Amino acid sequence: MSMPATADLYDTHGEKLRVAAPIFRDFGAIRSFAGAAATVKVFEDNSLVRAALETPGAGRVLVVDGGGSLRCALVGDKLALLGQQNSWAGIIVYGCIRDSVPISRIALGVKALATNPRKSVKKGEGEFDVTLRFAEVTIAPGDYVYADEDGVMIADHKLD
C-alpha cells in the first residue's frame, strides 16, 4: 500500500494524530504500512496472536500489547508468514519477535521492541478487541495506524 510518509501526514494533520514513542524497530520486508487496527492484549503467550492472524486481515494492522516483555517472542516467521498469507498489512508488537532474518524477507510490515529467541507459552490467555495503552498512545480497535521508518502514528479514522 502506498501512503504518504508519517512526517508528511503529521505536517498535514498534526494533532489529529497520536504519535507513539520512538521505541519500535523495523523487521518486516515492508517498512511503510497502514490499516485499521485490530488489537490483542497478551502477556508472554502468543496463542491469541496466532488466532488473530489466522483470520482474514483485509489490510488491517494487528497491534499486540505484550506488556513490553522482553523475556520471550510473540511473533516468529511462521506467524509473520501467516499474516502475509491472510492479507494483514502489518503487525506491531509491544514486545519481542524472533526469526528476524526470515521475517526480513516476508512482505509484511513488522515492528517490535526487540528480538528474543525464546518462544512464548501457549495457554490461550489474553483479550481480543480491547483498547490498548503503550508507547505513550492509546489504540482502540478500528483506529487507523500509520507506520514507516520514522515511527508509528494513530488516528481515530483513516485520513484523506
Per-range role (PLM):
Residues 1-141, 158-160:
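Feature captures the catalytic cores and cofactor-binding loops of soluble hydro-lyases/lyases
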